[in-house]
Amino acid sequence: MFHDAHCVFSFYFSADGKAHRKSRFTQENNRYLEVIMQNIIGISSRRLRISALALLVPAVSWAADTASLAVGPQYDTTHVYVERGKMDAFVDSILKTFGGTSTERVLVNVTPTPSKTYSQLILTPAGSFSVFDFKTPIPHPFGAERNGFLVRDMDAAIRQARAAGADVQVAPFDDPIGRDAVIQWPGGVNMQLYWHTKAPNYKPLLSVPENRLYLSAYRVDDFLKSYQAFSHATVMSDEQVSDTTIGRSDNGKIRQIELDSRFGKTRIFVTDGHLPYPFGHERTGYGVDDLPATLAKATASGAQVLWRSTAAERRASALVRFPGGYIAEIHQTAK
């Protein structure tokens, strides 16, 4: 509010550096800066309004920002819903396979309707995992989302996603440490957007994981148009490859597309849906320096190799089932 000789003016900055009106976020534990102007003597109302407007300009420009709202691929996590009671075994196997650390396990409600789950975050050099072991039935549509993308501004991200053609399956809601929403891209690709009250600070990844998508020829172009508009992803390759890449052996070809953005990498397989098990069950591909050594660590810690590429493949890779039911692709990074 502005008055000629008396002004009380307040706003705060969230941890990502964005300015907000205090009235919108009075219950959040953000780092904030409150500016109070009271009993200002000798300053005209016109000058005071100009000064206040100058302070607000950054907030206006950020809100209008149409650039990518991504923070970085190390903040984008694969969502893993483990079989009930298998969280210990899963976390132990992932850490022994990839290295890294995990946060303290907590029992929380991470959905907008009543539910309870154990939740734990695993940070590895090859990618991050948000792990859930629900103690209650899982509310729909949770469990179908592939991953979570950290965004700098939730409201702006929702606007951008909708403008790009995404459906908002779960409108933004508060969780214990921020806000979340679930969106769906053309082709039925679900993902969660999240924003933290206190901005996290994770080390850069040694290898950025791939979001692996299987789409039909009827929907892939719609997905690309929509997802690229939101993520500002660049097409790194778009080519025909042998269908042995997806475990088939009929000497056919499939279209494979690779994207890269600040949200991370995406590898798209355009298929007729005739996929041998376990292809299509994996959501993420992880790059490692030494595939044989990594697979040895995985199997020693309770994982099972379900499929492995042949020597004729362009990229050495394997599909691995970890304790708790999670299936991942692991591949040798180029040297």
Map each language-model feature to its residues.
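Core segments of cupin and vicinal oxygen chelate
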Residues: 69-72, 79-126, 163, 171-185, ...
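Bacterial N-terminal signal peptides that target proteins for export
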Residues: 38-52
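Vicinal oxygen chelate
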Residues: 73-85, 120-122, 134-160, 179-184, ...
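Boundary at the C-terminal end of the N-terminal hydrophobic targeting segment
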Residues: 61-66
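A cross-kingdom feature marking solvent-exposed beta-strand/loop segments within repeated
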Residues: 105-118, 130-155, 162-179, 198-202, ...
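Short, structured interface segments
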Residues: 181-202
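Bacterial N-terminal signal peptides
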Residues: 51-59
